[in-house]
Amino acid sequence: MHLIHKILVSLLFAAIALLPLQAQEKQEMNKKSNMKELRVKKVSAANVPVQAIPALLDQEKVDFQPINIVNWEAFPYCPSVEFRIAHTDDAILLHYKVKEASVRAVAGADNGPVWEDACVEFFSVPAGDGVYYNLECNCAGNILIGAGAERKGRQRATQEVLDKVQRWSSLGREPFEERVGECAWEVALIVPYEVFFLHNLTSLDGKTITANFYKCGDKLQNRHYLSWNPIDLEKPAFHCPQFFGTLIFE
């Protein structure tokens, strides 16, 4: 009986030791089950100017996807935001549509604090090596691009790289202070693969990558942090590739 008791005690301790691991595995499974997937259509945009991208995506019947997940109760405001994405032989095409209670475009140059303005963002891991890129664009078409495996120590794109991104904004390209009152705006971007400056990316044909899409406005009257794929963190954070969804490129 003493031996059986010792065996039972050992089994009990082994089971207890496994509980944190099982909980962690369950959390990982839940995280994966919440991840969204999106098929990215390939289109031809040869000689198409950036301002014509919305019309091209209409013609190609590329659907909009909502950016409408409010991840943090402290920031409940949820403007109407949607995006659509396609790709070509040499670039990613992005188109955002927004309706919100105010807009702001104080960051008047690239690599400035565009996240403080009315801002849409595209974060992605294009090469599967853990390095992710953050492309952030305010409502006047000024952008910021960073790259790295973590939030700290990120490398900013040079102006030469930033200039390769073609931008169109329905509000024009001039900076302005906050305008209060419901406003609808759009931006379109042509993002050539060479913008992923830490990699030698030449095509996304047939590839699957992870990514997330965001809307924020740190200094708008209604501060908010929306995402396409949900983020399970206590405080607002977009630099969290563990919560990216999946993009499947044709």
Segment roles from a protein language model:
Residues 1-6:
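Positively charged n-region of N-terminal signal peptides that target proteins for export
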Residues 25-250:
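Structural preference for beta-rich elements and adjacent junctions enriched in aromatics
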Residues 21-22:
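Sec/Tat signal peptide C-region and signal peptidase I cleavage site
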